[in-house]
Amino acid sequence: MASQGTKRSYEQMETDGERQNATEIRASVGKMIDGIGRFYIQMCTELKLSDYEGRLIQNSLTIERMVLSAFDERRNKYLEEHPSAGKDPKKTGGPIYKRVDGKWMRELVLYDKEEIRRIWRQANNGDDATRGLTHMMIWHSNLNDTTYQRTRALVRTGMDPRMCSLMQGSTLPRRSGAAGAAVKGIGTMVMELIRMIKRGINDRNFWRGENGRKTRSAYERMCNILKGKFQTAAQRAMMDQVRESRNPGNAEIEDLIFSARSALILRGSVAHKSCLPACVYGPAVASGYDFEKEGYSLVGIDPFKLLQNSQVYSLIRPNENPAHKSQLVWMACHSAAFEDLRLLSFIRGTKVSPRGKLSTRGVQIASNENMDTMESSTLELRSRYWAIRTRSGGNTNQQRASAGQISVQPTFSVQRNLPFDKSTIMAAFTGNTEGRTSDMRAEIIRMMEGAKPEEVSFRGRGVFELSDEKATNPIVPSFDMSNEGSYFFGDNAEEYDN
């Protein structure tokens, strides 16, 4: 669908891939999972966690954070050069939750980063295993995408909060590499570029000198990544123009926002991978499962099978609904924050509700929250069917959508029509066709107007029974079109704050 310049699967991006065949890719991804699992087991031993405590998703998040922080070289360097009161740049840690006398207790742990790096490398046969680190970053990013709506960030860059379906990966760190770039949505790339251009407008030296050259090549690289996500010639031509601008300014920002809006109908290709918390991989490895030998894929049945047989627990606040907490984590596990809820309900086999209807806050517990009233419960992460993840945006068509999110970004390669509210989207395009790109703009608008309601995306693709490992019998779901398809529907999800 979208030529990413080089035709490499994202498993190959994930594996420094020289072209590998499917078996090699599966083994290579499996090796990465093994490493995360072994590291997690070792950390649970260090922290003296019981089996139950080791399967607590909050402990998993703390342990994942610790290793990500231990390997964050840029930040580590910054912390050493700008020492701040009460922060030891050589240490990392966080809250670990333990069950003591029938109650959950919070314990703050602190480790030398050097020690954490040693444990990580040891679990990964002496390598830095950057891919495993990126994998955990993408899991955190997917969890953020499911938990928070980035309204403020969108408004700050001059975009519209209704464009939230384009914001996948907006909290991924800069160092997340090619695998990270593959999962970023159109809006995320546009936002990064706008921030850059704004700095250039405010800071005369931003594009100048030795540093400016690096900045410029980063700018062009980001433009090319974004261009690779677009699937129409006119959208790509627009990106060439933004990239080649001598002195990027407001005209480029306008073009970028225009192209982001257009992506609500002429969707870009964004990769989706099921990245699971470390506390899923750990127990699987501990039970003797050899991911490298068996092979593993982030985009096929494997994560579904793994979740089918995993026990994960979560702390629950007094007025939260454990079923809703489960839905939040399930969606995060499958990178499905912007997928059509009707399809998700079908795959999961239970109703998937919009974010605003869920009685649950984020998975993490703040340090000032009272532990006395905390309970824990099992997260229900199993599914009825499985489906193949997609990296194409699907072709487009129209349906009434909501006040909040007005389009979807498909996660699963399954036949359906893709809802978006054409009248709302097109209203944003009235007027401003003058300016230097009018021909491209006119072409893009013409294509958007031509998008038809009856068009079906992913024709003939279906979901599969969990017993159908080779994906031989696709089941094409039928949907109740009267149901709401958007997750962030006129929503009150919390904001994401760093």
From Swiss-Prot:
Quaternary structure annotation from Swiss-Prot or TrEMBL: Homomultimerizes to form the nucleocapsid. May bind host exportin-1/XPO1. Binds to viral genomic RNA. Protein-RNA contacts are mediated by a combination of electrostatic interactions between positively charged residues and the phosphate backbone and planar interactions between aromatic side chains and bases.
GO CC term, one of those recorded: host cell nucleus
Compositionally biased residues, Basic and acidic residues: 8-21
Signal peptide: none
UniProt family annotation: Belongs to the influenza viruses nucleoprotein family.
GO terms, molecular function: RNA binding; structural molecule activity
Entries under InterPro entries matching the protein: Flu_NP
UniProt keywords, alphabetically: Capsid protein, Helical capsid protein, Host nucleus, Host-virus interaction, Ribonucleoprotein, RNA-binding, Viral nucleoprotein, Viral penetration into host nucleus, Virion, Virus entry into host cell
Transmembrane feature ranges: none
One Pfam family, short name: Flu_NP
Residues spanned by motif Bipartite nuclear localization signal: 198-216
Taxonomic source organism: Influenza A virus (strain A/Texas/1/1977 H3N2)
Post-translational modification note: Late in virus-infected cells, may be cleaved from a 56-kDa protein to a 53-kDa protein by a cellular caspase. This cleavage might be a marker for the onset of apoptosis in infected cells or have a specific function in virus host interaction.
Known role: Encapsidates the negative strand viral RNA, protecting it from nucleases. The encapsidated genomic RNA is termed the ribonucleoprotein (RNP) and serves as template for transcription and replication. The RNP needs to be localized in the host nucleus to start an infectious cycle, but is too large to diffuse through the nuclear pore complex. NP comprises at least 2 nuclear localization signals that are responsible for the active RNP import into the nucleus through cellular importin alpha/beta pathway.
Name of the molecule in the record: Nucleoprotein
Region ranges (Disordered): 1-21
